[in-house]
């Protein structure tokens, strides 16, 4: 049987990795030869979840057409966030919870996108719809994905469906969602030992906003100053990325997981759009973004609107 690769976006977060594992397992149960893979390094937060539930992480691939003809995308759809040679393979399915942009196919496909906080929430439904029992380890990974995407249920992207799914999955996994979740988020917020290049690419996504090319990277921290003490070095590596990729804006967002506020570091010739979008003034290229924790709901649409205004 021909193999199908299942993967999330570049610079994968916990949902991208864990949903690839969970969906590949569901597809295997349904008779498909599916393998989860990843398009980037595994973060400290995701590694914590994999270690806790004793699951091996997916192998890394840069290209997919050299291995398979067919792929399944989870937790993304935009071409620039996907495999480098995504145009050379057929996308069979997409399971996602983000905006739909820069995506088209030559054939009809199964496309499932729901306005929930996490891909794993959708997968929880799909396991039930197919009458497949979720293994304890996989339930733990799916729970981890929801906790990560919802910032332990505090993000405005978090829905009642996400909370309900998390409670169900926690029961299957045999953990307390709140206690486990805090430990996992703290592990993700431990940025010691990371280079500046790693920091700005841990969870970075590229977007087309009107005519502007924008990259938004986000890291969680227990104290934003732990990250911003390296601002000069960060600006140097960000400026290099801006030049290399021809970006109009690189927004590096440091989110405090205790206060649920963020600080944005904006570099690029369109940095002023951040000021317009949030009605703030950049001082030394930074501004506090009160109550902003979600890239998907509080950054991407706000900036997109500002660029198109």
Curated annotation (Swiss-Prot):
Which positions does UniProt annotate for Mn(2+) 2 binding? 15, 75, 97, 149
Documented EC number(s): 3.6.1.1
Q: Which GO terms describe its cellular component?
A: cytoplasm
Recorded catalytic activity of this chain's protein: diphosphate + H2O = 2 phosphate + H(+)
Q: Which organism is it from?
A: Bacillus cereus (strain ATCC 10987 / NRS 248)
Q: Which NCBIfam families match?
A: PRK05427.1
Q: Where in the cell is it found?
A: Cytoplasm
Explain how, and how many, cofactor molecules are bound: Binds 2 manganese ions per subunit.
A molecular function (GO) term: manganese ion binding
**Its gene?**
ppaC
Q: What is its main location?
A: cytoplasm
HAMAP family for this protein? PPase_C (MF_00207)
Q: What is the protein name given in its UniProt record?
A: Probable manganese-dependent inorganic pyrophosphatase
Question: Which of UniProt's keywords are assigned here?
Answer: Cytoplasm, Hydrolase, Manganese, Metal-binding
Class in the EC hierarchy, top level: hydrolase
């Amino acid at each position: 049987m021909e193999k199908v690769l299942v993967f999330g976006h570049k610079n994968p977060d916990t949902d991208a990795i864990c949903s690839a594992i969970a969906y590949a397992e569901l597809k295997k149960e349904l008779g498909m030869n599916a393998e989860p893979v990843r398009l980037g390094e595994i973060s400290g937060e995701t590694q914590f979840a994999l270690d806790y539930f004793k699951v091996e992480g997916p192998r890394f691939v840069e290209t997919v057409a050299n291995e398979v003809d067919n792929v399944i995308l989870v937790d993304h759809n935009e071409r620039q966030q996907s495999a480098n040679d995504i145009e050379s393979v057929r996308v069979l399915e997409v399971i996602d919870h983000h905006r739909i942009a820069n995506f088209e196919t030559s054939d009809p496909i199964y496309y499932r996108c729901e306005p929930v906080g996490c891909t794993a929430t959708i997968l929880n439904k799909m396991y039930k719809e197919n009458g497949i029992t979720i293994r304890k380890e996989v339930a733990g990974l799916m729970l981890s994905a929801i906790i990560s995407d919802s910032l332990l249920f505090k993000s405005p992207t978090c829905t009642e469906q996400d909370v309900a799914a998390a409670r169900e999955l926690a029961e299957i996994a045999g953990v307390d969602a709140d206690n486990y979740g805090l430990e996992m988020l703290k592990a993700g917020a431990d940025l010691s030992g990371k280079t500046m290049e790693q920091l700005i690419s841990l969870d970075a996504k590229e977007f087309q906003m009107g005519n502007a090319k924008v990259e938004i990277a986000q890291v969680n921290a227990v104290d934003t100053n732990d990250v911003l003490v390296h601002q000069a070095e960060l600006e140097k590596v960000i400026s290099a990325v801006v030049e290399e990729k021809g970006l109009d804006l690189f927004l590096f967002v440091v989110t405090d997981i205790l206060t649920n506020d963020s600080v944005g570091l904006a570099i690029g010739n369109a940095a002023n759009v951040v000021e317009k979008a949030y009605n703030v003034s950049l001082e030394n290229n930074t501004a506090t973004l009160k109550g902003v924790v979600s890239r998907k709901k509080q950054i991407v649409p706000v900036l997109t609107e500002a660029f198109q205004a």
